[in-house]
Amino acid sequence: LSRKKNIDIIYKANHKGKILADSQAFERIMNNLIDNAIKYSENDSKIIIATSNEVDEYIKVIVEDNGSGISPEDKDHIFSRFFRTASARATDNQGSGLGLAIVKHLVNSLNGEVGVQNSESKGSIFWFTVPLA
C-alpha cells in the first residue's frame, strides 16, 4: 500500500542496546502502527519511524505520519477496543477498531507504555517504550 500511495518510509535508529521483547509481539506492534500510518497518510507523503533511549532501561519507538490527525475528543478513546475515529468512519478506510487496542495490550504485556501525540490536521506521532535487555 505504501508503494501504491507513493509514501516514503524513513527509519532513524538512534538507540543503544537490544530490545527485551517477544519478537512476534514486537513485530505485531510495529505492523499495526505502520499499517495505520500508511492507511491514514496522504498520497506522496512520508512516514518516519525512529528509535531512541529516553530512559536508560527502555527504548522508545515512534511512528510519525502526516495524515489527518486525531481530534482531542477521539484521542481519549483511541486505544479502546472497536473505537474508530470520526475521520476514519467518514472515509473508505476499512478497520475494526482493534489494531490500537491490540498494540496497547501487547506493549503493556512487554512492561512498556504507549501513547499518541498529535496536532489535528498535521498528523500523529504514536510512540511506545519497551525494556532493553
What is the predicted role of each segment?
Residues R3, D8-G17, E54:
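Conserved catalytic submotifs in the C-terminal HATPase_c
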Residues F26-M30:
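A residue-level detector for a conserved hydrophobic packing site
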Residues A37-I38:
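Short helix-loop "hinge" at the ATP-lid/N-box region of the Bergerat-fold HATPase_c
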Residues D44-E57:
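Short beta-strand/loop element within the Bergerat-fold HATPase_c
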Residues D65:
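Acidic ATP/Mg2+-coordinating residue in the GHKL
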Residues G69-S80:
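Short helix N-cap motif at coil->helix boundaries in the Bergerat
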